Amino acid sequence: MPNYRRANQAGGSYFFTVVSYRRQPIFCEPAFREALRVAIESTRTRYPFEIDAWVLLPDHLHCIWTLPPNDADFATRWGQIKRRVSLSCGEQFRRDEWLASSKRKHREATIWQRRYWEHLIRDQQDFARHMDYI
């Protein structure tokens, strides 16, 4: 797995954008929403975080999380959430014609783009700007 440069700050607040694979408008499908809700609850049990804001759009989502003190590992949390959703409803949204060899090799579903965008919230003004955006 590549080692991406990430702005990690224990106890920090982060703004995320996560996009569906090929911008499929599946994020508002009832099965997806339920799988996402369950995945978030399950992940938060093992890896706690606060959800400050969340918006779910047809092909992407935005959210703001605050991590616990002494914890900056949002990547594990996103990995858990994406994995659980894929296991729960991946077959329903599977598109075999989209499975390139690299997606087959990594046993990926056709639900998520591989990466996501994150932004470390720097101060209260930055937090307010991102809350307004959501």
Language-model features: where?
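Short catalytic/metal-binding and nucleic-acid-binding patches
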Residues: 1-133
